[in-house]
Amino acid sequence: MALSDIALCARAQVMIGASPVSSFDEDSAEAEIARLLYPTIRDGMLASYPWRFAARGCWLARLANTDDDRDPGDGSHLFAMPRDFIRLLSLENDGGKITRFELRDRAVLCSADAAWLSYVARLAEGSFPPWFDLALIARLAAEFCLPLTESSTRAEYLFKRSEDQFRAARLADAQQSTPHAIDDFSLISARN
């Protein structure tokens, strides 16, 4: 079942014994805390690991160097990052990986004429897989706990629990594709 941002926050609030919100616009401490913390926590969770379910790729649009502050002057080019960009996984062109680059204010600077970006994207909550939902709910509960319950002991417990859920989510995500095999390693060839 796909969960919305409100549903994720409400489940986290239930975990700590708080009243679940039905809207971020409610006039309650629960709604205010969820509204303020949720986007940052969601983006932080997405950025914390190269999630396969959130991996995207695209050719980047080259920016015109009209602003003197942005023009590197060394033959490098600026490329605009996509709006849903959260984390860079790799940068490539037709010649292979681009190893030297720099992120600058929603753009990437590199010496290539074209660039393919592999990245983690900000997705709609309904497209999160169940294992990520569980990890995000656990993290939200840990983050919401102290401001809503003022219990540092419970918050500490919930942070440990959220780390366990995060590890389980990473494992589940890693199992969503065939593992990379080392086929041409000299020591393996020597054993045969």
Language model features with spans:
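Glycine-enriched, solvent-exposed interface loops adjoining structured elements
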Residues: 1-192
